[in-house]
UniProtKB/Swiss-Prot annotation:
InterPro entries: MoaC, MoaC_bact/euk, MoaC_sf, MoCo_biosynth_MoaA/MoaC, Mopterin_CF_biosynth-C_dom
EC number: 4.6.1.17
Disulfide-bonded cysteines: none
Keyword RNA-binding: no
Active-site residues per Swiss-Prot or TrEMBL entry: 130
Function recorded in the entry: Catalyzes the conversion of (8S)-3',8-cyclo-7,8-dihydroguanosine 5'-triphosphate to cyclic pyranopterin monophosphate (cPMP).
Annotated transmembrane regions: none
Gene assigned in the entry: moaC
Protein name: Cyclic pyranopterin monophosphate synthase
Entry's Gene Ontology BP terms: Mo-molybdopterin cofactor biosynthetic process
Amino acid sequence: MRDFTHFNEQGRAKMVDISEKSITERTAVAKSSVEVNKEIYEKIIGGKIRKGDVLAVAQIAGVMAAKNTSQWIPMCHPLSLTGVDISFEWEETRNHYLLHIEASVKTTGRTGVEMEALTAASATALTVYDMCKAIDKGMVIGPTYLVKKTGGVHGDFERSSSQKS
């Protein structure tokens, strides 16, 4: 278990001590998606979902989730985020409506924001599902994945085009 930083000498979980790490700018981008039927797509676009503006509420949920990631993920450090942005893009093909979600997170600190970006993308997708499930419970969420991250000891990461979903 030597290779895992989240275990102590007894093999039990611990939160990693980051006090000696350098303060640097850290960024991360994660993506998710929600596949919906035509009725849901048209109602979201037309502002006809009874619970309200789906994309506005989902966007706020994503920002809130990023800010509260350490409450959800046990070994995540509480971070002071300097920016969170949630964006949407529709992909429409014949009888196929896919809402692409991108969550970008930024901080200046001692640890990265990958989990915050992934949590934001996930919570955004879950909120879309929650607000539309009365119409169709067959929506499909995902895949959810890290696109890129910058900063830190381990350097930058960018998912290759062959790894992209």
